[in-house]
Amino acid sequence: DRSTLWNAAEFAEARKDARVAREVEVALPHELTPEQRLALAREFAQGLADRYGVAVDFAIHSPHGDTDVRNHHAHILLTTRKVEREGLGEKSEMELENKRLIALGLPTSHDQLRDLRLDWEDRANRHLALAGHDLRVDHRSHQACGLEIEPTQHMGVHATQMDRRGKSVVRARQDADQA
């Protein structure tokens, strides 16, 4: 039950302004069926739970109306604390400072992020191959891939809503005609 989980996450913290969750957002391949996208998101979320020992909750979002039909994505929330027999316990590796991670012989936050991106690449590519697609996901940036494509600027929810209503938006999608 989601509400029980997130109430427990709030209750586990002593500070009222404590972080109770980390979000990982992943783009789901639009070439996959809804069932295949769900299986991929579920597998990745389970991998995060297994790796960090935390509770994981996720939601899949599909494109809205006449927007980019390829914008299938998942929002994955991880508790900041590990799941233990009595409830939520110590902070997970993802929440520790690099100084402490290094002292414990664990990957730094930068290395953890790279590993998550590699894990997503591996899982997404496996699911694409199983579905008969020869497309591949690459975890690297455009620059690291040697592409001279400028990354687009994320509009954000409020600017997107204004744009959909036909209002003037300073931060409009620059790649709309390249879709």
What does each model-identified segment do?
Residues 27, 31, 35, 76, ...:
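Short, charged/polar micro-motifs that form catalytic or ligand-binding hotspots
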